[in-house]
Amino acid sequence: MFEPVELSNNAVIKVVGVGGGGGNAVEHMVRERIEGVEFFAINTDAQALRKVEVGQTIQIGNNITKGLGAGANPEIGRTSAEEDKELLKSALDGSDMVFIAAGMGGGTGTGAAPVVAEIAKELGILTVAVVTKPFNFEGKKRMMVADQGVLELSKHVDSLITIPNDKLLKVLSRGISLLDAFGAANNVLKGAVQGIAELITRPGLMNVDFADVRTVMVEMGYAMMGTGISSGENRAEEAAEIAISSPLLEDIDLSGARGVLVNITAGFDLKLDEFETVGNTIRSFASDNATVVIGTSLDPDMNDTLRVTVVATGIGMEKYSDVNQTKNKSSKEILMDYRYQYLNISPTAIDKKNVKNEIKETDNKKRKEPEYLDIPAFLRKRSD
């Protein structure tokens, strides 16, 4: 049996959109009225910030960019965030949990998001990042810049969810409009934030507090997220199976997850046996050593509908450990790596192996890059 725990809804949760894509995703969440969280948009582009309808906006790097954006250069994004580090620290201070949303491959999102994450971690905040990777047609240069951004970000977050934009093409109809496609993408990010936040902020039959969430997500590395919705007689089993078998999650082995966080959202008609069904379905793929936390959120508007949100953390921990060994590098070494990756990748088609060899010859060092896991949450409308 799964035992209920006491509710604690005093946790301060902030959602920070970094760059154009992150700002658009956060604006979508504001419109959807996710409860119990504060929203921020951070950008180098003053015009973009004026257009976004978010609770609080923070312009960074004005002395560097003059409010004109990072120009798809992550170095400008990084230095802009460093310039206004105290301003960012003030915005994040007092948080218990911070979600960072960004698009990798552009300027502000790629360069500034790791700085924001580093500040949050220095403040002792539980830090979760949800980022996108570019479509293949955007070119190898942008993809490699995105990979480097993910690598930098992974050093400063507790859990990292990456979303490959190309997987979006497999779950949407070919005739869908561009606007609807990006709306669907933002819904995935919303689902990740909402599913976790509502466990803490919204009352349910089986409540979960912030300490439970922290246990599952702190220092866990790569993570995945899936959502399933169903109605009718077998809604519990169907929703749980959809959540763990989304096409967005293909080729991902969930059995190695060290932590699993589950939120069941339903109306007042939620039955105990449905709670058990979801729990048993989730445990069928989780390892015996995984920490599994299952809670519920009651939504009176969900008549006959049940939603299951699953966040599996600690996936591919060996790869994540290899990545975090780079923490021992000096900041100068990391900066030189980052600049080389961005400035020396030709915009034409280049074999990634050749680029890695060039980097190796420059440093006289071998570098290991993790095989990034394709895991869900939101899709970028803009990456810088």
Curated annotation (Swiss-Prot):
Entries under Gene3D superfamilies matching the protein: Tubulin/FtsZ, C-terminal domain, Tubulin/FtsZ, GTPase domain
Pfam families tied to this protein: FtsZ_C (PF12327), Tubulin (PF00091)
Keywords from the named record: Cell cycle, Cell division, Cytoplasm, GTP-binding, Nucleotide-binding, Septation
Subunit structure: Homodimer. Polymerizes to form a dynamic ring structure in a strictly GTP-dependent manner. Interacts directly with several other division proteins.
Main location: cytoplasm
Role description: Essential cell division protein that forms a contractile ring structure (Z ring) at the future cell division site. The regulation of the ring assembly controls the timing and the location of cell division. One of the functions of the FtsZ ring is to recruit other cell division proteins to the septum to produce a new cell wall between the dividing cells. Binds GTP and shows GTPase activity.
NCBIfam families associated with the record: ftsZ (TIGR00065)
Protein name per Swiss-Prot or TrEMBL: Cell division protein FtsZ
Protein family: Belongs to the FtsZ family.
